[in-house]
Amino acid sequence: MADPLPINLVVKFGGSSVATADRMMEVADIVCGFEQTTVPIVVLSAMGKTTNLLLQAGSEALNASPKSVGSLHSLREIKELHRETAERLQVDDATVDDMESLLLQLTQLLVGISIMQDLTPRAKDSLVSFGERLSTRLFSAYLRAKGIPSKQYDAPEIGVITNDNFTNADVEYEDTLSELRATFAGLMDGTRSPEIPVVTGFLGRGKTTGAITTLGRGGSDLTCTLLGAALGLDEVQVWKDVDGVLTSDPRIVDGARPVTRLTFEEATELAFFGATVLHPLSMQPAAEYTDGAMGVRVKNSYNRSAAGTLISKTRDMMDGEDLVTSIVLKRNVTLVDIVSTRMLGQIGFLAKVFEIFNSEGLSVDVVATSEVSVSLTLDPAKTLWERDLIDEELESLMNAFTGVAKTSYRRGYSILSLICNVDKSSEILERVFRVLGRESVNVQMMSQGASKSNIALIIRDDQATHTLRVLHHEFFGA
């Protein structure tokens, strides 16, 4: 008998790809349809809207009596979805028992939230973890029911180590990569019987507390690239519900089309400035811990034949082509203006400015400076629990600048980001401002980062959708 092949691919499937029992069956067909020489690890998100339902259940539990928690609509919906899925997939009794145990633990956690009348960040992470823990158990059991050896793994237990910043934890890379390598060493060197590992995405373990943490919205993408980097693979695949990374948001721009190639830098900028197809930090393991040797391919689980998008360290930039790769929109940002003549020639002024933002717990996106002023944008917290900045937070920020600088803020703006060849910025901006002038759109602020791949324009929210469409037509003709 031939020696077992080592793991040579990591594939991640998002929530929409595993939203129902039928979708899980489709994903299983994809996994089983790889060439015989391909041995994958499968990373899964929670089923469909499960994460949102878990968040809703947590909020509802705060307003419910402990005795009524079991009848919460969101909790009933979660139980119904997973029980129906288990029945449709015809999983074994042991998996059903495991599922019911998790659903009981979920109910008990919600009762505790109701009793304590508190939903701490730590409790939130524990709460939403049930989505991935349930989906992976059901999917792994379905593979086994089809006669395919498979084992389920919870990422917090196999080595995804983070700090203890609950709801948006940062990965401890050296610890994580080492532990993941150790976990799967037997499957890499052929000393263990071949099986398809099915791993929870999105979850980690706090280094100090040992508690479950989460990696922020879309964190399963990061789990995927972490595994690929740890195992030294040539490629990982992130399967979504679109044909790869697109030239714009297809929900806004009808003519958005797939981008064939991207660099890690371009993909990171896209994710950070509004493209929801990838987690902003998911490129970091590939770019920094494989020396750029690992590619990330984005594929469509609803359209397997689509080529998708390959993201790599470098790509060819055809002269005269690829002026703009994609245009993305981030809405509902706040614009802050800081003015002080003390900036003139003063060492450390900007450091003091950013220390104030740090002490206020506010994240800065885009920055533009002049001799006596700084303008920047603030974004809602980049976590699973996104929300609007509230007036009290902004007023606290204004007060923190008392005696330092004159500060004001304006709400209701959007960041329109052109992921582009900045070496051609003169041509790009000439065309951009010609269109904006024609459409009577005023730019409140502009920033061109050191990355050489992004130009950010700050415009009013109420003009953002139309502006995105006309600029997309200008550069992509659709």
Task: Show the residue positions of the predicted features.
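Short hydrophobic alpha-helical runs that function as membrane-insertion/retention elements
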Residues: E235-W239, R297-V298, D365
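Conserved beta-strand segments of alpha/beta enzyme cores
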Residues: P149-K151, G295, N442
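Extended, compositionally biased low-complexity polar/Lys-Gly-rich tracts
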Residues: E195-F202, T213, M294-N300, G308, ...
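A conserved regulatory-domain signal marking ACT and ACT-like small-molecule sensing domains
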Residues: S305-A478
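Glycine-rich beta-alpha junction loops
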Residues: M47-G48, V242-G244, V296, N300-S305, ...
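Nucleotide/pyrophosphate-binding catalytic subdomain
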Residues: M1-L278, S282-M283, I458-R460
